[in-house]
Amino acid sequence: ADQWEVLGTKLATQFSNSIRNNFGFLNRCEDSDPNARDKTFRQEGRKVFKEVVPLAAAHIEAHLAALEQAPTAVRRYWLHQANHGMNQLVIKKLVGADAGADVAPLILDEFANTASAGSIIAFHKHRDDLAAGDLGVICSFGAGYSIGSVVVRKR
């Protein structure tokens, strides 16, 4: 069995109205239609994309900088698996170039969007080829916005 050292963890949240749901326990206190459009999940997809990409890239970059590591020193990025284009843009902002599945593997074709579990599934399925000493970043990001990352090194 392979072993991994956790070099650091980092969490961040930033409020956004681009993803929201106004339904909750306080709705019983107001005279409004419980089936109204604002009581269901809604998302402004393009706005979310434009807001999350720089947030995720900056989060990962700051996390690596705190550990005195450059984004280009990372052998593999296991990112949130909701949108291929979003992942590619995050990686491009980090390493300055397009990256293939060897650097940022995808599992969307096999599992679709598995929410925050996607980065862990990607890690599970795409880690065996790394050598001792290789660095990796596991990062999930999503609604609200929340971002969590773990920087690991293979032993």
Which stretches of residues belong to each language-model region?
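Short, flexible active-site loop motifs that bind/organize anionic cofactors or intermediates
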Residues: R46, L64, D109
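Short, functionally important structural connectors and interaction interfaces within domains
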Residues: D33, T40, E61, G100-L106
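Alpha-helix termini
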Residues: L64-E68, V95-D98
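Condensing-enzyme catalytic core mediating Claisen C-C bond formation in acyl metabolism
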Residues: A1-K50, P54, A58, F141, ...
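A generic secondary-structure signal
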Residues: A62-A66, K125-H126
